[in-house]
Amino acid sequence: MVIRPSFRERSWLPALAAFVLPLAQALAAPTPPLPPPLEQPKPKPAQVSSSEGMPPLPYPVVPMKRQEKKNPPQPPVLLTKIRSADAGDWTRTPNDVKSLLEWISQQMNVHFSSNIKPFAGISADPAQNPILYRSGYKSFDLTRKEITLLREYVANGGTIVFNSLVGHPDAYQSALQAARSILPEQSLYRLRMDHPVFHSFYEIDKVSFRDRLVKDGLATDPHPWLEGVDIDNRTAIFVSRWDFSLGWEANQHESWGYADADARRLGANIVSYVTAMRDAGRSVGKSVELVNADKKSAGKFRVGQVMHDGPWKTRTAAFPMLLNQFHVATGTPVSFDLRDVSLDDAAIFEMPFLFLTGTTDFTFTEKQRANLRQFLKNGGVLFAEAAEGRQSFDSAFRAEMARVFPDRNLAALPANHAIFQQPGKLGEVKARAALAARSNNRIEMAPELYGIDLNGSLAVIYSPHDLSAGWERAIAPYAQGYEAADATALGLNVLYYAVTH
C-alpha cells in the first residue's frame, strides 16, 4: 500500500524543501580555510636606568648638541584600513595594505601611505581617505549611522573595497549586503573583463589561484571575481569574492584566494583605477539643475529610459542635459524628467521615444521583446548607446536586436544619411583619448551609428561608442566615445530625426 501525504502535509513540503536544500548544499560545500593566527605582540624593551643608558662624560667636556636628520615628508594617504570592534577579525593580516603599497612603489615609482581607522574616524571627504579597505573573515552588519556616512562618502567620490579574508563566504555575503545597503538604488553586478579596472595598469585576463581554492574545486572560472556598484559609471564599491590580503603580504597560509602575483596586480589595478577616476564625480551636469517650467507633460517631448537586468541607470544628468540643448537649438518643448520604464509595462506605448544604455551584457524576456517589437512597429523610436563604449553591452544589444527583428539587420548608417545632416552637418567627430587609443590613435573619425529601418524610417538608432559622458561634460578617462561638443551634436541630430520622422 502506498501512503500519500495529506493535503495539509503537502502544503508545508515546499517550505521544508526551501529550508533543507540550501542547508544540504551548505553542508556539502567545502569548509573554508581558517584565518591565519594572530601575531603575538612584541615584548616591551627592557627597562634601564638613566645612568645605565648614558656613559659618563669626562669633565670638563661639554656635550655637543646632536644634529637630528629630518625625516622625509610622509607620502599622501591613499588606503585606510577599517578597524572593526573585533580585533580577532581585522588584524589577521596586519601588513597587507603596507606590503601592497610598498610593492606598488617599486613597480610604478609612485609613493602612497596608509593608516588604520574605525568607521567613526572616517571622513566623508574622500580627500582625507581616498580608498577604504575592509578585510575580515567573519560576518558583519553596518549600522544605520555607518551606512549614512558611507553613502555620503561614495557620493562625494570615495571608493570602498571589501575583501573576504581567506575567501570566507560569511564575510563575502556580508560585504554584498553592505554594498546593497549603501547604494540600494544601483545594481550590484559582477565586473566583466572589459571593465577598465582589469586594464588600468596591468592587462589582466586569466589569473592563478592558491592551491586550497583549486583543491576544493572552486577555481572553475579562470577570471578574477570582483563585484561592484557604480555611480555614474564610476565603480564606487568593490567586493572581492576571493582573498587579496594574503597575497599582498606574501603570507603562505592556505586560503581561497589569488596567487601572490595576481593578488598584487589586481590591487595595483584598483589603486590605478581609483586614482584615475578621482575627479570623475565632477561634471557640468551635476552642477546644473534642470527644472520643468510647468509640471504638465502634455505637448512635450517625453523620453522613457528602459530598465533591464544589467546596470541601466548610468549618467543620470546626461540625457536631461541633451534635452536642454535640444530645446535651446530647436525650440521643441521637452520634459526633463525621464520616466523609468520596463518593457513589460504598457506605459512604453504612451511615449514616442525610448532611451537604452548600460555598461554590461543584459537580456530581455520574450514578453519584453514582443512589447518592444510592437512599440517600434507602432512608430516609436529606440535610441541606445554603449555607455563607456563597453564591448559586453555592445554584444548583448546586437544579440537582442537580432531576437526582436530576426529578419532585419542592425546596419551601419552611411555618411549621407539624413541623421548626419540636420540640424548640424556631421562629417567628422573627435574621439576621446580612450577611443583614440583603441582606434590606432586616430583622433578625428567619421561618426558611427547603426540602425534598423521600418517602413522607410529608423526605428532603432544605436551608438557603439559613449555619448553620455559628452552630454554631461563629464571627466571620464575610460569612456570610449566622442568629445563633448561632437557627442552633443550627434545626440541633437538623433533627437531631431526622431521628432521630424
Predicted regions mapped to residue ranges:
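Short alpha-beta junction capping motif
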Residues: 11, 131-172, 353-394
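Bacterial N-terminal signal peptides
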Residues: 14-25
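Aromatic-Pro/Gly-enriched surface loop or interdomain linker
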Residues: 30-131, 135-138, 244-245, 253-353, ...
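An acidic, glycine-rich "communication" segment
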Residues: 75, 170-250, 257-268, 299-302, ...
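Structural recognition of the beta-strand scaffold that forms the well-ordered cores
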Residues: 80-81, 130-134, 159-163, 188-190, ...
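Extracytoplasmic/secreted envelope proteins and their assembly/folding machinery
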Residues: 94-101, 147, 151, 172-176, ...
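Surface-exposed patches in mature extracellular/periplasmic domains of secreted proteins
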Residues: 110-120, 162-166, 186-194, 280-286, ...
